[in-house]
Structures are given as C-alpha cells and as structure tokens.
Design a protein with these regions (language model features):
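Long beta-strand-rich cores associated with HINT superfamily self-processing modules
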Residues: 35-202
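Surface-exposed, low-hydrophobicity interaction/linker segments
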Residues: 1-38, 68
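Low-complexity, intrinsically disordered segments with a bias for serine/threonine
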Residues: 205-206
Length: 206
C-alpha cells in the first residue's frame, strides 16, 4: 500500500477484521467439501486455501495499474505463484455472487493466502447486496451449480425451485456493478529461478 501511494496509486485495505476465517466458517466449508467431494476431513482441510485473506480496493480508473503493481511486488518477495482461485487464468470474475479479481498467492512451502482485488463500487455492492444474496443461496442450495445446471435438475425434480429464484436474483444484482476499463484476462503468474513471468503477457486491454 505504501509503495502504491508513492506511485500516486490510491489503494486501501478493506475488512481487516475478517482476514482470518472464523472457526465456524472453516468448519462449515470443510463440511460442504466433504459432502460434495466425498473426502475425509483431513483431505478437506488440504483443499481449503483461503484461511487467510485480504481485500485491496482501488478507484476504478487506477484498478489495472494497482493490481499489476501488487502482483509485481509479491513476486519480487517471498511468493512465487499467483493464480485465480480455482481457475487456470486470472480475470475479472462474473457469476456466482462475485465481481472482482480473486487470487491465491503461494510460496515454496505451499502456504497460500487469498487476495481479492476490488473497485470501490464492486466492494460496496459485494458487501451490501451480493453477499446477503449469496449467503441465502449457499445456505439453501448448492451455490456451485450454474443457472443452467439448476434448471436441468428442476426438470428431474432434483432441486428446490427457490434455488433458481435465488440464483436469478444474484445474477440480476451482479449486472449493476460497473466493470473496470482495460480488464480482460491474464495467465497464471509463476516465478522460476528467481525470474518473474513478464507481466506484459497479461492480456489487459489498453
């Protein structure tokens, strides 16, 4: 944050009181993973990578410069891998109650932290609008299912119709969030032999 301020890039940390997942939150997540993937508790704990998380917020017009600066600083220090949570490429997420860039940062010891990158608008909508809708969906349905998958299950009477209604509410709410300019996608970043992948390989629109 201090380095970005020196570069005249405005940034702030959001929600530091939630940087560590609570015991209840972790227990709930372990339970969901065990049920969905049919794994043991020990296996489920190894699959959870977001026990520590931070959220960095930028003004919309400074978003891309801010994100690239943070990635560069992390790779110059103790971290060697930046990936999008659960995916092969890093991009602005749309869907499932999330709007922003959500990354996992890892070191040689396979210690990971989650860093979310938001604009002032996207964090406001996430906190006040999307999160309550997502929690309603998560508590009553399988939130990982797409709308299309839910509709297929409904044909077989394998899902509560309310789940589709919750999902549609979430999709409608997401459309209200402005997407920053110059956002497209970026390949996962890794550091090899102390050399950083060229950040220019990130396909941000200029």
């Amino acid at each position: 944050i201090k380095d970005m301020k020196k570069m005249n890039i405005e940034a702030s940390l959001f929600g530091l009181m939630y940087k560590l997942k609570s015991q209840k939150s972790l227990a709930d997540k372990y339970s969901r993973i065990m049920k969905r993937q049919n794994v043991t508790l020990n296996e489920a704990t190894k699959l959870v990578k977001d026990g520590i998380r931070f959220t960095i917020v930028f003004p919309k017009e400074k978003y891309v410069d801010g994100v690239l600066n943070v990635w560069s600083q992390l790779l110059k220090n103790d971290f060697n891998s930046i990936t999008r949570k659960g995916k092969d490429e890093i991009r602005w997420d749309v869907g499932d109650g999330y709007q922003g860039i959500n990354t996992l940062i890892s070191n040689d010891n396979d210690t990971s932290i989650e860093i979310q990158f938001h604009t002032k608008n996207s964090i406001k909508y996430k906190d006040k609008l999307l999160h309550p809708l997502y929690e309603k969906l998560r508590k009553n349905c399988d939130e990982k299912l797409s709308l299309k998958e839910m509709e297929e299950k409904l044909k077989k009477s394998n899902i509560n119709p309310k789940c589709i209604s919750y999902k549609k509410d979430l999709i409608r709410a997401e459309k209200k969030i402005p997407i920053p300019e110059r956002i497209k996608k970026c390949k996962s970043l890794k550091k090899k032999n102390n050399r950083i992948n060229d950040l220019k390989s990130c396909q941000f629109i200029t």
